[in-house]
């Protein structure tokens, strides 16, 4: 069956409107020598059975692997099948927030529940309806801090995700704001003495990872105290959101803004994305928050309803008054996270977080028995750096065994301690005891 949307009469009518005799006349600007004057060399059309057979043949060429031990900002977690089934419902299956949002009460309620989950896990007062990802959420936090404080300097921990820092630099290139990077110490935490020297009266905000890129739970309370004393805001960026089921909420530790990604809830790794970014802050900063907010209200009949409010995007108001130019957010990915968190509940999330930390401890014990000691001494959640001697060689060796190992740290930190051997590894609920032992024994051999 051929799928031609236009009848000959449709084509003739359109050509008449533009004053052309033939379809070829539309391409007169292209030199004749560059035009294809024959049909495309394609194989005959396949029926459905033959097509699926060919797809299975191609899929068989892929190498299957165990759950990867690589994290570095994107983590392997179990996604309950019901998440995808609910996402496929026609009412939800779009990344877009409708231009007439009030007619899509289900979508707005889902975003409202997302905001509720974000606030509960971060200890903040308000959340928006999602961001593109953790990196852009972090950059938007720096822009918001500049608007609030009127300052032009951002102090960033070197242990913040390096790719978050790259996106931040891209955003601030046009504003002219200065970025000062503070080193981390032997424990993998931000060097507080260096941070104290870097923070001054020009500082708009201090940004730390929580946990940071090295897997270490950074010194957020101490950093927040230093920032507060200088009149600056503190931004906590979380790439592994399962940690918030075990760690204290960033808001409880003094952070003014909490950002990051909920990829770990309901969203597969998918070669690094997409994944929903989150942005939460104190109520006093509500009107400076980027994006848009789903709010609850009551109509004339006293019925509860949901609306989009505080949409201070440049699509809605004057550019000079806008807080961001974010367009389509990650609504569908945010819905996946909302469904997953609803299924887990408070107790389930706590159990999942404890299980992740337990598997990380199991990995640490196994790696130490294999002669691979941890590089950093600071507290960790489910990710840590080990000295394996030659990280690149270990990754290549394990790949032959069907194991995707961790990420060689030298890719981002060539001058870090034990850089050549430093391997960043994550362990989640998907990494059972047998797989962890296989990983460690293969590294040792």
Curated annotation (Swiss-Prot):
Q: Name one Pfam family in it.
A: GDC-P
Q: Which reaction does it catalyse?
A: N(6)-[(R)-lipoyl]-L-lysyl-[glycine-cleavage complex H protein] + glycine + H(+) = N(6)-[(R)-S(8)-aminomethyldihydrolipoyl]-L-lysyl-[glycine-cleavage complex H protein] + CO2
Task: List the CDD domains hit by this protein, alphabetically.
Answer: GDC-P
Gene3D superfamilies for the chain: Aspartate Aminotransferase, domain 1, Type I PLP-dependent aspartate aminotransferase-like (Major domain)
A Gene Ontology annotation in the biological process aspect, one of them, is: glycine decarboxylation via glycine cleavage system
MF-aspect GO terms: glycine dehydrogenase (decarboxylating) activity
Q: What does this protein do?
A: The glycine cleavage system catalyzes the degradation of glycine. The P protein binds the alpha-amino group of glycine through its pyridoxal phosphate cofactor; CO(2) is released and the remaining methylamine moiety is then transferred to the lipoamide cofactor of the H protein.
Looking up HAMAP family in the UniProt record yields:
GcvPA
Q: How does it assemble?
A: The glycine cleavage system is composed of four proteins: P, T, L and H. In this organism, the P 'protein' is a heterodimer of two subunits.
The family classification in the record reads: Belongs to the GcvP family. N-terminal subunit subfamily.
Q: What is this protein called?
A: Probable glycine dehydrogenase (decarboxylating) subunit 1
Taxonomic source organism: Anaeromyxobacter dehalogenans (strain 2CP-1 / ATCC BAA-258)
């Amino acid at each position: 069956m051929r799928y031609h949307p236009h009848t000959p009469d449709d084509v003739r009518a359109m050509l008449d409107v533009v004053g052309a005799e033939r379809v070829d006349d539309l391409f007169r600007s292209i030199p004749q020598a560059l035009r294809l004057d024959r049909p495309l060399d394609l194989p005959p059309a396949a029926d459905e059975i033959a097509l699926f057979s060919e797809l299975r043949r191609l899929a068989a060429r892929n190498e299957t692997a165990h759950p990867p031990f690589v994290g570095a900002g994107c983590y392997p977690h179990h996604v309950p099948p019901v998440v995808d089934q609910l996402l496929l419902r026609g009412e939800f299956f779009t990344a877009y927030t409708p231009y007439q949002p009030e007619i899509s009460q289900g979508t707005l309620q889902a975003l409202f529940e997302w905001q509720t989950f974000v606030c509960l896990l971060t200890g903040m007062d308000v959340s928006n309806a999602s961001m593109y990802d953790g990196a852009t959420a972090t950059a938007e936090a720096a822009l918001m801090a500049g608007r609030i404080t009127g300052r032009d300097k951002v102090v960033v921990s070197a242990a913040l995700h390096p790719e978050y820092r790259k996106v931040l630099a891209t955003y601030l290139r046009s504003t002219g704001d200065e970025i000062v990077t503070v080193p981390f110490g032997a424990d993998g935490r931000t060097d507080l003495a260096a941070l104290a020297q870097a923070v001054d009266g020009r500082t708009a905000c201090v940004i730390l990872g929580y946990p940071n890129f090295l897997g270490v739970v950074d010194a957020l309370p101490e950093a927040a105290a230093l920032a507060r004393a200088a009149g600056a805001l503190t931004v906590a960026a979380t790439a592994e959101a399962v940690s918030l089921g075990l760690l204290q909420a960033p808001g409880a530790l003094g952070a003014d803004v909490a950002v990051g990604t909920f990829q770990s809830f309901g969203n597969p790794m998918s070669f690094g994305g997409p994944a929903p970014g989150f942005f939460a802050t104190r109520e006093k900063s509500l009107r400076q928050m980027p994006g848009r907010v789903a709010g609850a209200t009551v109509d004339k009949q006293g019925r509860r309803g949901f609306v989009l409010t505080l949409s201070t995007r440049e699509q809605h108001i004057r550019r000079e008054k806008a807080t961001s130019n974010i367009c389509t957010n990650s609504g569908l990915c945010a819905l996946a996270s909302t469904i997953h968190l609803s299924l887990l509940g408070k107790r389930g999330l706590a159990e999942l977080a404890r299980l992740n930390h337990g598997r990380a401890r199991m990995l640490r014990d196994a790696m130490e028995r294999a002669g691979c000691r941890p590089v950093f001494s600071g507290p960790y959640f489910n990710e840590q750096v080990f000295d394996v001697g030659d990280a690149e060689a270990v990754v290549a060796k394990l790949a032959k065994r069907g194991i995707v190992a961790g990420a060689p740290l030298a890719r981002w930190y060539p001058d870090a301690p034990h850089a050549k051997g430093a391997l960043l590894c994550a362990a989640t609920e998907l990494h059972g005891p047998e797989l962890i032992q296989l990983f460690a024994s293969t590294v040792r051999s």
